[in-house]
């Protein structure tokens, strides 16, 4: 019987790619792929035929090819060879454009066309035909008989592994396959399914012994085997995914997150346990096991995985929910197989990263309670304290085992001691049990700094458990011990507790009344320390004052030598006597902020205070502050009659006003302590000095009145010559000062006249105001001149003064009236000029001639036309409505819509490269230019997505 063998020859369906006929004879041999012994197809490197996108120089993973896409099983029975195709992919395997079923095997025949992958393969139905003229990986099944060159070539390359590229028809040989027992099991499974002889030796059967490998049954592939159908097999000994060597990577947060997302997605599809967190968590564990089984992809295989999981976890929480919905879960797990493949690849990548990192040996800390046995390398626990044995530690724990009655008593004593810290009472002695507990707590704190926390933690927990209360968290030193008896030495004397003066130890300026009172006491004590007393103090009535001075560091030794009564007053700061306080020292003290405004006794005193500033006499300009203080103290109107000093404008008066607040405060505080005899003597002495002072003040007031008259005469006489006007300009500054003096003297005169004087001063002020404005230059605004006229109409006296003005004033009035008349003439001329009438609008429907506007310069558009062909561009209709993102090629600067490139309106990052030309173009650019992105967009069954606004 003639032996017939089948093989695959690569055909190029895409017209834009190179054709098979263009190759030489040697290259045509490279387009043949042998099917002897069975083959596996996919994009994973473990397959016999590896599909790659691009060319031999650029290797990229294809988009519509699975890791393990399909298998071809080869059987040989009675000299008849059969080739069966099995589809295990998501995007389908097609024979003569008919989609294969996943659970069936199709027999290959000579002349069939087999295509791997389709852009819409995930949505195609089995046993239905779908045209795919531009398939990247298409092959024609050819037959060869013995004696033909192709027959010998197929026999030569039966064990080789090749790479097939989408851009070229020639396959690249990457070396022979390695034989393995796993492939023999797969071959035996294929033979037994088709009625072939079964192999006796199997890796799963323990009774059979291994036999030498059959040279006529070579290994077929490097993929992981399925569970055998007709041989005994125990699933608990199964080692999926390399015995799960990636078990460390399974605990990665990224891997767990992907599993949780897949479980949540399946729960949403099911709809029954969306909000049941227990079922979702159990489902994530099931999916974790599903990742390990790489080759179990069909529905029946998924049902087997779910059944085994439910059986192993029988009795767990919510397992019955999964077992009742096994059929639905199997269908969803089959649909989620592409996502499962991505999760599996993530697990492999995480494990590869973990293998690169070299693990360091475990190092034990110095305070560890474990030691390493050199022989076995196992950590064994040892005692923390090497000097103490285990028996001593047990005896120590027994020694602190206090009874419940004593522990309650200790708790009460602790509470009493803590309360004693708040209330100032005498310290109470502690019981012996309490002292033992405190001593051991101190020892525990000392051990805490020396030994490991294992020993200290046991110790502290035992103490807290014995005492039946919350452990003490504060410092142990807070709990006081028994009090000591009070003894005093014979040579030492008791000292009274004294309050610290707040003013000396604070930065306050006396903002409250209490601070002000304490301030006065401290000020008086400071005066006592600096000045001292002229006469010995006398006891006052009532006995409230004491002779104890304010203690200082220098007087501390002197203070301890004298005994002080027990019933001494708490505030030891003494009051000051009026006779022992010089007024000059009192006036130099700072004035509190809350002290009242000082007042003057009468109008005469106001004149006496204000006149020294106006008199040229230096003696009267700086009066003696002692005399002023005595005058204010001796007069009876110091308490009753008060007149404000707000109108005192002279500098000397302000300096006197700064002196008076402290004088008024000190005199008010000392007046209560003065005796009647001292007051009488003070009045006699002060009255004599007052008379002398008043005479000097009267003389100075007469001289000031003369100066005021001279100033008025000088201001009233006009300058008739230019020389005199220049002199007047030179004396402007001096006249301003004299006018201020004039106002101050007029205010002082108004105090003597009373109410009638107030009215006259108002008129004088108005008259002065009007004359000053009249002397201003004519370059000022007219509004001020109108105000002057209104002021002239107010009072008759002002009008009379203006009539009697000298010749210079008349000239200015004439100039003012002339300027006003000129302004009126200008206004009338403006009114006489008639404004030009605007042209009337013509009625009718005739359009007005448009004005010629300059055309703006034409600007080039920022973005050009999309580099994708017009028929494949899916973003043109969204350019006006959506804010589309663009990307340009780094070589030719050709612009592309990001939506046309990868169906996502997210800008490229700076570290990402985009190339549409050159030797290494980007995969996304090639897909967009080849129309794959457009085809994928059109193949979407549901509503097409719309580009969303990109977040900048």
UniProtKB/Swiss-Prot annotation:
Q: Where is the composition biased (Acidic residues)?
A: 523-537, 789-800
> Bias regions of kind Low complexity — which residues?
662-679, 715-724
Under SMART domains, the record lists: FHA
Entry's Gene Ontology cellular component terms: nucleus
Where in this chain does the entry annotate a coiled-coil region?
Answer: none
User: Is Transcription regulation among this UniProt entry's keywords?
Assistant: yes
Q: Where is the composition biased (Polar residues)?
A: 179-195, 202-220, 569-584, 600-620
> Where are the stretches annotated Disordered?
174-220, 483-639, 652-866
- Alphabetized UniProt keyword annotations: Nucleus, Transcription, Transcription regulation
Write out the biased-composition intervals (Basic residues).
761-772
Domain FHA, chain residue ranges per copy: 39-100
Asked if the record carries the keyword Transmembrane, the reply is no
List localization entries: Nucleus
Name the GO terms of the biological process aspect. Answer: regulation of gene expression
Q: Provide ranges: composition bias, Basic and acidic residues.
A: 553-568, 685-706, 725-742, 823-832, 856-866
| Protein purpose | Potential transcription factor that may play a role in the regulation of genes involved in cell cycle G1/S transition. May bind to regulatory elements of genes.
Give the protein's recorded name: Germ layers disorganized gldi-3
The organism encoding this protein is Caenorhabditis elegans
The lineage is: Eukaryota, Metazoa, Ecdysozoa, Nematoda, Chromadorea
């Amino acid at each position: 019987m003639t032996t017939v063998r089948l093989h695959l020859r690569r055909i190029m369906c895409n017209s834009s790619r190179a054709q098979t006929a263009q190759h030489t004879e040697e290259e045509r041999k490279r387009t043949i792929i042998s099917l002897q012994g069975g083959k596996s197809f996919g994009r994973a490197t473990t397959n016999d035929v590896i599909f790659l996108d691009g060319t031999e120089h650029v290797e990229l993973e294809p988009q519509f090819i699975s890791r393990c896409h399909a298998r071809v099983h080869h059987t040989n029975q009675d000299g008849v060879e059969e080739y069966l195709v099995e589809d295990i992919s998501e995007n389908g395997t097609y024979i003569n454009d008919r989609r294969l079923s996943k659970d069936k095997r199709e027999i290959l025949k000579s002349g069939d066309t087999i295509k791997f992958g389709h852009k819409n393969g995930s949505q195609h139905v089995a046993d239905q035909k779908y045209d795919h003229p531009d398939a990247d990986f298409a092959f024609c099944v050819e037959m060869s008989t013995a004696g033909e060159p192709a027959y010998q070539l197929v026999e030569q390359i039966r064990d080789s592994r090749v790479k097939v590229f989408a851009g070229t028809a020639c396959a690249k040989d990457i070396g022979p396959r390695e034989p393995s027992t796993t492939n023999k099991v797969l071959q035996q499974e294929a033979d037994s399914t088709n009625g072939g002889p079964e192999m006796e030796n199997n890796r799963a059967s323990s009774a059979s012994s291994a036999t030498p490998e059959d040279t006529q049954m070579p290994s077929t592939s490097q993929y992981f085997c399925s569970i055998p159908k007709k041989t005994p097999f125990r699933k608990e000994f199964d080692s999926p995914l390399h015995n799960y060597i990636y078990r460390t990577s399974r605990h990665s947060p990224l891997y767990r997150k992907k599993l949780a997302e897949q479980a949540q997605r399946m729960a949403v599809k099911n709809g029954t346990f969306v909000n049941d967190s227990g079922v979702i968590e159990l489902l994530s564990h099931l999916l974790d096991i599903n990742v390990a089984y790489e080759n179990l992809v069909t529905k029946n295989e998924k049902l087997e995985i779910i059944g085994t999981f439910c059986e192993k976890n029988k009795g767990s929480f919510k397992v019955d929910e999964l077992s009742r919905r096994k059929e639905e879960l199997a269908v969803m797990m089959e649909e989620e197989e592409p996502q499962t493949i991505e999760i599996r690849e993530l697990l492999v990548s995480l494990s590869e990263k973990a293998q690169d990192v070299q693990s360091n040996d475990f190092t034990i800390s110095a305070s560890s309670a474990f030691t390493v046995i050199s022989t076995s390398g196992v950590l064994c626990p040892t005692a923390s304290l090497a000097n103490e044995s285990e028996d001593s530690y047990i005896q120590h724990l027994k020694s602190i085992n206090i009874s419940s009655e004593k522990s309650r008593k200790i708790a009460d004593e602790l509470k009493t001691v803590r309360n004693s810290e708040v209330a100032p009472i005498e310290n109470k002695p502690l019981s012996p049990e309490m002292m033992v507990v405190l001593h051991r707590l101190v020892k525990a704190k000392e051990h805490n700094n020396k030994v490991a926390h294992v020993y200290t933690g046991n110790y502290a927990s035992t103490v807290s458990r014995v005492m039946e209360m919350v452990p003490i968290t504060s410092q142990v030193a807070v709990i006081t011990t028994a009090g000591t008896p009070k003894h005093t030495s014979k040579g030492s004397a008791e000292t009274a507790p004294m309050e610290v003066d707040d003013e000396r130890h604070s930065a306050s300026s006396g903002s409250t009344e209490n601070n002000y009172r304490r301030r006065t006491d401290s000020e008086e004590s400071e005066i006592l320390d600096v000045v001292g007393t002229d006469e010995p103090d006398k006891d006052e009535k009532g006995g409230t004052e004491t002779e104890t001075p304010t203690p200082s560091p220098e007087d501390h030794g002197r203070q301890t030598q004298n005994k002080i009564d027990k019933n001494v007053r708490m505030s030891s700061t003494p009051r000051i006597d009026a006779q022992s306080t010089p007024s000059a020292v009192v006036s130099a003290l700072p004035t509190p902020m809350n002290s009242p405004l000082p007042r003057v006794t009468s109008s005469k005193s106001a004149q006496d205070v204000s006149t020294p500033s106006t008199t040229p006499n230096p003696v009267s300009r700086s009066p003696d502050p002692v005399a002023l203080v005595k005058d204010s103290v001796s007069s009876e109107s110091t308490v009753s009659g008060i007149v404000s000093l707000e109108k005192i404008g002279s500098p000397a008066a302000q300096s006197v006003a700064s002196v008076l607040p402290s004088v008024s405060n000190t005199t008010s505080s000392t007046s209560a302590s003065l005796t009647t005899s001292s007051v009488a003597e003070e009045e006699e002495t002060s009255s004599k000095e007052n008379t002398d002072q008043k005479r000097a003040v009267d003389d100075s007031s007469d001289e000031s009145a003369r100066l005021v008259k001279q100033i008025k005469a000088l201001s009233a006489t006009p300058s008739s010559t230019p020389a005199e006007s220049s002199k007047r300009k030179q004396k402007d500054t001096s006249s301003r000062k004299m006018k201020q003096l004039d106002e101050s003297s007029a205010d002082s005169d108004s105090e003597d006249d009373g109410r009638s004087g107030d009215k006259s001063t108002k008129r004088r002020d108005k008259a002065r105001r009007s004359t000053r404005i009249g002397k201003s230059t004519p370059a000022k605004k007219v509004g001020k001149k109108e105000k002057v006229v209104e002021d002239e109409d107010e009072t008759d006296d002002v009008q009379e003064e203006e009539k009697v003005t000298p010749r210079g004033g008349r000239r200015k009035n004439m100039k003012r009236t002339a300027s006003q008349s000129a302004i009126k003439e200008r206004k009338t001329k403006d009114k006489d000029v008639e404004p030009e009438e605007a042209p009337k609008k013509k009625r009718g429907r005739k359009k007005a001639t448009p004005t010629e506007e300059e055309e703006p310069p034409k600007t080039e558009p920022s973005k050009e036309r999309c580099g994708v062909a017009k028929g494949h561009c899916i973003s043109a209709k969204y350019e006006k409505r959506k804010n589309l993102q663009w990307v340009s090629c780094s070589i030719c600067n050709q612009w592309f819509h990001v939506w046309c490139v990868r169906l996502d309106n997210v800008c490229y990052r700076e570290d990402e490269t985009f190339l549409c030309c050159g030797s290494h173009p980007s995969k996304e650019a090639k897909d967009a230019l080849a129309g794959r992105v457009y085809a994928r967009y059109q193949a979407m069954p549901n509503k097409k997505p719309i580009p969303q606004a990109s977040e900048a």
